[in-house]
Amino acid sequence: FGWCLADYNTHREFGSGDRICYHGVMDLFRNPKLSAAVYASQKTPRAPSDIVLEVSSAMALGDLPGGVPGACWVFTNAESVRLYRGNDFVAEFAPDRRGRFAALPHPPIEINDFVGSLLEKYEGMDHASALQAAAILNELRRDAMEPSPLSRARMLSLRLGWNDVLRMYYKYIGVLGSPAAEYRFEAVWHGRAVRTVVREPVQSVRLECVVHNPILTDGPTWDCAAVSLRAIDQNGNLLPYC
């Protein structure tokens, strides 16, 4: 987590070389970074508009070391988060009230199952077998395709060969070069989805302009307005490299 509000100008002994300290949860111009969502999500919601939903990962395999998906966290003050792959429901996640972030009013939610109920629907597995197979695939996703002894034991129990596991991994999780999936995250509050984030390949780019103080007042000092510009995709997601 960041330890101060915003980045700031500093002396030459910082490693960035531009005399700016980048410790803030916002940048010099008060544009929020990802860590700002951690703090924003600690607010107790009183209306749907108070719900925060920020997904840590862009879900773009080519943007990750070795194309390995790694961890995905959601920063939210919702009661739970539903994950969809395309139009298929995958799983619903709730905050871990006993985990390492249990002291927070609204702990970040780790999205650690990207297979969920899909194996029952598309592979014809029974519920118990689907849970074990999904555990294998999610572990491979987390551990860069390195099966643990437990996963190998599960494969033997399910009579799954390595080629069977690879086929399902390519289909339900994916690797570099495979068709990219659309993921939809829904924040659930009082039993209904009140905010949505969609992650999919970028199809269009537009420039968003937000004026934070639209009325300037003529007075004894100069008034000014903060204007923020962001490059966003078709779903309103920030494009950080533009």
PLM regions and their residue ranges:
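Short, solvent-exposed loop/linker segments at the N-terminal edge
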Residues: L61-G67, I215-A225
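Low-complexity, acidic Ser/Thr/Pro/Gly-rich terminal tails and inter-domain linkers that flank the onset
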Residues: I51, P201-P220
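Beta-strand-rich interaction surfaces with strong enrichment in secreted/lumenal proteins
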Residues: Y172-V175, T196-V198
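Short beta-strand/loop motifs in extracellular/secreted proteins, especially
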Residues: E79-R82, Y183, V227, C242
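Extended substrate-binding grooves/exosites of carbohydrate-active enzymes
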Residues: F1-L166, E186, G191-R192
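Edge beta-strands of extracellular beta-sandwich domains
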Residues: E92, G191-V205
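Extracellular Ig-like/FN3 beta-sandwich strand-entry sites
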Residues: S178-E182, W222-C224
